[in-house]
Amino acid sequence: MDYLEIHSENFDDIVEDIKQRNLSRNNMPKIIVGTGLSVIYGVPGMKKLAEHLAKEIAQSSDQQLKEIWKNHCDEIEANGLEAGLANIAQNENDLVDAIKPITAKFILESEEKLHRTIYEKDTGFCRLLNYLSGTVSVDKKIIDIMTPNYDRIIEIICDKLGIGVITGFYGSLYGKFSRNLLKQPTEVYNCKNYSWIRLFKPHGSINWISENGKEYLTNDYEILKEKAEYIEIVTPGSSKYKVGMTNNTFRCMREEFNELLNPRDNYSLLIYGYGFNDDHFDTALFDSFQKNVLILSRDVKPDIINKALEKKNITVFYHEDDREYMIYKSKKYTIDVPVWDINQFADLFIG
């Protein structure tokens, strides 16, 4: 296996090639963002959530709930929350119902404490969005992002950068969902003179409320705190596909983003901090692996690494066994810098 120093002439050519294939106007990336982004801002990821759920359930008076958790806790500790609850039985759905409001409240309260930090902190992700907003097509200044994250980090960053966010909801205090806002944003928004992020959240968001058949988006923290049990998210343990198909907003988010992954269009994929834990969405994503793909993630599943070793259009930066790696044009290298870290990536590719 070859060794490459990042700050060398040999790597300069690789940087320029990746920028052309993955970060240019002609190959504007569709971006998939996982919990790797949440972690760098201090918002709890799945590991911290699992610890919090364990503590909350231990304090519950519901013995059946404790028993169900006990049945899965070894798997959760060994393979993470999502994998540990992936095969939850039909008669164990009480656990899923219980963890939804706990999860919503935990993420909401954690994020609320960090709003100022998120807004003020300069990260590689900020620089990436700022760079892409200046690179995007002059005719349609829209950058598409899909995230399974519940938090509002992306929205806060966009406010900081002065980039508008198209969420699919319209209204000021109590936004209502309209599929057409996602599908045809140019009918409503000025996408020629201003840059926009079109944000798809197929697993919901901590500012979505669904109560008594009515759904709305609000950023009023007091309302969200009061209505935490009605926050609309798909939690670990849920049948993501089933919930995603029965909830209209989740389904629209998924379907509209999948439609953007059209093989006839020019685009690339930039996947950051995403764990590939949604089988049905990942199937659509893998179909787009014929395009140029750039993956930045500390931990990458073996099957993704194997795909990169087979396909020259997939570039991966990741960490394994205390070493940093790059797979580039089907060849694996050890490198001297953790380029999977978005801050390091931005230093190298954006400056």
Model segments located where?
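A general structural signal for short secondary-structure junctions and capping/turn motifs
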Residues: Q20-S24, P29, G134-V138, M146, ...
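SIR2/sirtuin-family catalytic core signature
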Residues: M1-I31, L37-V39, V243-G244, E255-G351
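Extended, H/D-rich, highly charged conserved domains that either
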Residues: E75-L85, S137-V234
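Short, flexible loop segments at boundaries between secondary-structure elements
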Residues: D62-Q64, G175-Y189, I295-K307
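A Trp-anchored, charged/polar loop motif used as the substrate-binding/catalytic surface
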Residues: N10-D17, K121-Y131, N180-T186, N248-L260
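Gly/serine-rich nucleotide phosphate-binding loop at the start of the catalytic core
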Residues: M1-I156
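Acidic, metal/cofactor-coordinating or nucleic-acid-engaging core segments within structured domains
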Residues: E215-S268
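Short helix/loop capping segments that flank catalytic or ligand/cofactor-binding pockets
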Residues: I40-G42, I154-I156, W208-N212, H280, ...
